[in-house]
Amino acid sequence: IPGLKAGTYNLTVTTNSGTITKENIKVYEYDRSGYAHYDAHKEGVTGIGAYNDDGTLKSNAVVVYVTEENKNTVQLPGYTGSQYPAGIGNILNYKSEDANGVTGGGKIDIVQQLRAEGIPLDVRFVGKIRGGDSNTSNNPPAENIKGLTGYNTTTNGGTKGDNGMMIRVYKSSNVTIEGIGDDATLDGWGIQIISQTGYISQGFEFRNLNFTNTPEDAIGLEGTCAISSSPQTKEWFESNGYAPIKFSWVHNNTFHQGFCKNPAESD
């Protein structure tokens, strides 16, 4: 049960079949003594991703649940309608063709809008969500995740020579990507957080997820760098293209073997 402080709780679940109550459920807190929180606290930042340091959800966070059934149709609560992207790939990757207007008619870059408004995003995956195509998988899903980078192409922000099947999240901050239950699985695809010049991205959390059959990275954290032949100040780097990913917390995930049916690259 995400979003609870450490303590003891009674839980009641009511369904069409009846009601069941479980008492004295103990909730333990995560260890938040690592560098993601240590460095954040030094800069006056509290709470990594969509959660506060006590484990509760930030009061203004937007939460979206993603399943295999709704992976290409879901929209963020409060951000629905034809002007907003639909599907988790198009929501997170503004370079996807269905989000940036190449074929989708032009959508609002919702991730950057949330960043500008100071609204955290919590993406909760339920069950197995499958991605991939005939180039990367021996058993691709009936419908690939729209918005994934293309295989060996620049489609949806991809790179020639890459195996693709990545959601590339640009210029964002305060995002939690998490699994609900012990079977939340990203099968055949991965997520990459990317900073760009002038947009230092910070505050990312990946937790309670299984990754399997990933043809590229399962999780990627990619900043930009600046090069100088002589020592420079921190301010120089920040004004000359240096944009790191800051305060990233990757924990309690399981990484299974990756797979690509027909690798487009040799590394």
Q: Model features per residue range: what roles?
A:
Residues 1-124, 128-163:
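Extracellular "leader-to-stem" segments immediately downstream of a signal peptide or signal-anchor
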Residues 130-267:
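Right-handed parallel beta-helix
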